[in-house]
Amino acid sequence: MEMTDPRNISIEEYDYPLPDERIARHPLAERDACKLLCYKPGQAPEDHIFSELPALLEPGTMLIYNNTRVINARLRFTKDTGAAIEIFCLEPDCPADYAQSFASTASCSWNCLIGNSKKWKEGVLTMPLEVKGVKFDLHATRTSAPGTPGQTVRFDWNAPEVSFSEIISAAGEIPIPPYLNRRSESSDSTDYQTVYSHIEGSVAAPTAGLHFTPALLGRLDEAGIERREVTLHVGAGTFRPVSADKIGDHDMHSEFIAVDRDFIADLADAIDAGRPIAAVGTTSVRTLESLYHIGVLMAEGRWTGELPQWTPYEPANGDMAASEALRAVVAYLDKTGDSTLLAHTRIIIAPSYRYRIVGSMVTNFHQPASTLLLLVSAFIGPEWRQVYDHALSAGYRFLSYGDACLFTR
């Protein structure tokens, strides 16, 4: 079945009034005490508490979440002139592999955003540090010409016993969302991480996962819910507003995903067995749906390493069964000898998109006129507005530290 091209959608159709006081500036003291709005198309919204999730999912559900961990991506340097320069690390450049970059013990370079860039046209920035009892200087050098917001910065330090991961953990700040309108606080280092995060690389949290606690994970296990992991490193583009009038003029940001071969095989088996597939957060949704289209491209010999944003809407994308597409990924990995799929995705999920993998999703309430709201609308239809109106009238808290939804199709 061919999908309708959504490029003519006007983002204004997905705007809604969000009073500032409804934006949660901090999380609740108990993560799983937040509200959970449950909705299935054609039914009325139901109000629950997040801790009730095990009883709201069908036994046998495969629940898939994003194990990425937010890094302390903001590094603040001060020039000799007193000018403050902020370097926001986005993704590794050399080495390009996240794990290798974090393990570097002398130098590495990153693609960055630079705050107060006009004050740093040349020269080396220096930050004195002490990590693990070792005193040294961290140096930052621009390796691309000034003039554009995105820049490549090389970091150097003379402390071979200290890794770059340890440096940013000690010297950096957690990059909380700009719409919170506050500086990061010490509590954000814990609050803005999921309890199951362990793969470093994100500059924003997969916020639907913030509601889980170790005790809740245990109760999910007891309820017969199978928990599995994928990795998508969330980029700063997740906060970038849609500035174009039409979705077709919006350039979707690229994000890195890593998915184990054995999980992909198990997911194909679960789909064939008719088991419910639930995703925690839009990042897991984008990863799982990307897997399908990557599999189609691999089967057709058209895979290049990155999934373009409009591929799902092309007639040539075919109508392959979900499990068949997933097994095409497994076959590709077996042929290359890789145990993990490493890829980038630019997929945009918008109304008319046909979901291939995900049957339920846990997600927060998203910003007006955002691509994440398009993803939700593609899942539950135009009733998203009814659901959001209910949440606003019922006192739900919005955005990253806010309440959650459980949508089922």
Residue ranges and their predicted role:
Residues 2-409:
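Surface-exposed, charge/polar-rich loops and edge strands
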